[in-house]
Amino acid sequence: GPWLIDVQGNRYFDAISSWWVNLFGHSDLGLRAAIGEQLQRLPHVMLAGCTHEPAVRLAERLSARTGGALGHCFFASDGASAVEIALKQSFHSWRNRGFPNKKQFVCLKNGYHGETLGALAVTDVQIFKDAYGPLLMQSHQVESPDTRLSNEAASLQAMAQLHLDQRNDQ
């Protein structure tokens, strides 16, 4: 659960949950059992051109949740790595289609995506921009959608079109 216990036995509600996110709480019994069971079967396999049954089952469950729209799954070891891989796949896709200059990215203002260089490039946290700006690829921040506004979809579409019109070869 969300509780941390110090050496004196004091309990603290973990409102920080690691630096940025902790999806599962601390020491969840079901998660511990599933990890232990998997360790007994296959502790680690690199999914580079191969797979295993739990990965296949998870991919099928994810695809089913999208109504079958998700045709492929790529599993990464953590969120920052997943963002990094998505950026590389996007660049690679554009390059393969004859657009090697498309190497800038659009991201949401105030977004945080991890601390690899690629993830930091699409993160809008000033302390990271100040520290690592010269190392980061170029990105453009746009306002986050506000679903409380009735015309949000139209304004978001107009903003996206304006952004693309200004940078269509990037």
Question: Can you annotate each of these PLM segments?
Answer:
Residues 60-169:
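PLP-dependent aspartate aminotransferase-fold enzymes
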Residues 45-53, 69-73:
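Short, flexible active-site-proximal loops enriched in glycine and acidic residues
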Residues 11-15, 37-41:
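Short acidic (Asp/Glu) and glycine-rich catalytic loops that position anionic groups and cofactors
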Residues 16-17, 105:
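Short clusters of small/polar residues that mark proteolytic maturation junctions
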Residues 1-3, 20-37, 48-60, 121:
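A structural motif shared across PLP-dependent enzymes of the aminotransferase-like
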Residues 26, 44, 113:
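Histidine-centered active-site/metal-ligand motif
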Residues 1-14:
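Active-site and channel-lining beta-strand-loop segments
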